[in-house]
Amino acid sequence: MNHLIVFAHPTANSFNAAIKDSIIKQVKMHKQEFKIRDLYAINFNPILQYNEILDFQDKQYSPDIAFEQQQIQWADVIYFIYPTWWYSMPAILKGYCDRVFAHGFAFTSTPDGPKGLLHGKKAFIFETAGDSEQSLIQRNLKQSMVQVLDVGILQYCGIEVLQHKIMPSIHEIHTNQHEQYLREIEITVQQQINL
């Protein structure tokens, strides 16, 4: 099984980085193949230019995007790891989705509507948030945070989302809660590998 980690946090010593390391630990332990796309480390350009939109119609992709698409094609399971910024994903990850999950690669148009082209792939989303769970639920933000990436992007492209784990109050919780989150993530990855 091939595992692709799409990591969108600018800090190497963040809790998001600990999540990434926990996934890598499990994947290595089970002798699985994995690749990491650290969007900040590779200085990914998130800006979708108009000429790219035109090129997508002819399935013409710039070399950097074609490379990222090859990573998606290679993967059986994709992990998205990112912090919540303004109740959404960081702009660098949104730009990654805008540019990489392009028309002709990730989805196409049919007389019956859009059709996803990435069926058979699975995704896990691990998202940290500074806000409390109660606050997210009271303001209906939790559902909107899930809808955008899970339904509006990944499922639209045919990818099955197996879990979207939002970890709230990430800056206020104690170390033992961080460790509990990491254990839960390791179990999730292990269960996926053992399927």
Named regions from a protein language model:
Residues 31-33, 120, 158-161:
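A generic structural signal for alpha->beta connector loops
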Residues 41-44, 102-104, 115, 151, ...:
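Generic secondary-structure boundary/loop-capping signal
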Residues 1-105, 169-195:
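N-terminal beta1-alpha1-beta2 submodule of the flavodoxin-like/Rossmannoid cofactor-binding fold
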Residues 37, 126, 164-167:
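Hydrophobic residues at beta-strand termini and immediately following loops
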Residues 108-156:
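Short, glycine-/small-residue-rich phosphate/pyrophosphate-handling segment
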Residues 136-195:
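Glycine-rich phosphate/pyrophosphate-binding loop and the adjoining helix
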